[in-house]
Amino acid sequence: MKIWVDADAAPVAIKEILYKLADKRKVETIFVANRVLKLPRSQHLHFRLVAAGADVADGEIVRLLKKGDLVITADIPLASLVVEKGGTALNPRGELYTKENIAERLSSRDFMQELRDGGVETGGAPPFSAKDKQRFANAIDRILARLR
């Protein structure tokens, strides 16, 4: 099992949790981004640089993903592809995407996009909080215990 991180938009606090977790759990963790990231030295941490462009990192993650891998992403279309391919998708706020909830999440995302495209101001996600960080840490611990 590997952990893939859609790293371009991942909060720093989540990356820091993943750095520690990779060594503690001895799980290969690959950060995929279209700009260079400095990672701590570790045999368990890896970085893949992809070309700039919409969904390039997503495509690389889906291409390399194996059934049973875990993907950290806030990108709902990417999460949908991960679930479809037999992977597990977790967002940085600790929400697990599943076969049971991904269609609803995609539908809601698409609806909000239609509103924005129509000029409606929908606001954004609330700022990333300490509670979000804790929810993520708890969720990834549960997932890794189940997957390993």
Swiss-Prot record:
InterPro entries: UPF0178. Disulfide bonds: none annotated. CDD domains: PIN_YqxD-like (cd18720). Pfam families: DUF188. It comes from the Bacteria. HAMAP family: UPF0178 (MF_00489). Belongs to the UPF0178 family. This is UPF0178 protein DP1304. It comes from Desulfotalea psychrophila (strain LSv54 / DSM 12343). The lineage of its organism: Bacteria, Pseudomonadati, Thermodesulfobacteriota, Desulfobulbia, Desulfobulbales.
